[in-house]
Swiss-Prot record:
Belongs to the mago nashi family. The gene is MAGO1. It is found in: Nucleus; Cytoplasm. GO terms for cellular component: cytoplasm; exon-exon junction complex. SUPFAM superfamilies: Mago nashi protein. GO terms for molecular function: RNA binding. CDD domains: Mago_nashi. Gene3D superfamilies: Mago nashi (3.30.1560.10). This is Protein mago nashi homolog 1. Core component of the splicing-dependent multiprotein exon junction complex (EJC) deposited at splice junctions on mRNAs. The EJC is a dynamic structure consisting of core proteins and several peripheral nuclear and cytoplasmic associated factors that join the complex only transiently either during EJC assembly or during subsequent mRNA metabolism. Heterodimers with Y14A and Y14B. Interacts with EIF4A3/RH2 and RH34. Part of the mRNA splicing-dependent exon junction complex (EJC); the core complex contains MLN51/CASC3, EIF4A3, MAGO and Y14. It comes from Oryza sativa subsp. japonica (Rice).
Amino acid sequence: MATVAGDDGGGGGEFYLRYYVGHKGKFGHEFLEFEFRPDGKLRYANNSNYKKDTMIRKEVFVSPSVLREATRIIHESEIMKEDDSNWPEPDRVGRQELEIVMGNEHISFTTSKIGSLVDVQTSKDPEGLRIFYYLVQDLKCFVFSLINLHFKIKPIQS
């Protein structure tokens, strides 16, 4: 695992993150998945077969400061203190998976797709699921920004 040096609020040490959300339905297996790998590689995949779309795959290497920001987001969310035992089980609507390694802590969550905050509020563990819901929103925004910026910026010609 990679070592994330510096004061990231997350204790430094090893870091790995993987998020998946998807379902199998009318258009086949549709999903969004991204992971921050130990070597700094950010992998992103988005598969939608709607109107015969093809899978989008992107890979970029990110700097240690980007990894520090990801660990800060996770640490501040306090998701590492949560337990998914009272969260909705994956169903025909879909599933979400979140796996995180930070330092010597390793968590893995699995739950159903969350359509809105109403789904969160009516669950058996609204506080824990709310933390998960907002963390996932933050991580998606972070990853989409990194991927979009990386592939839209033109290199400087010398």
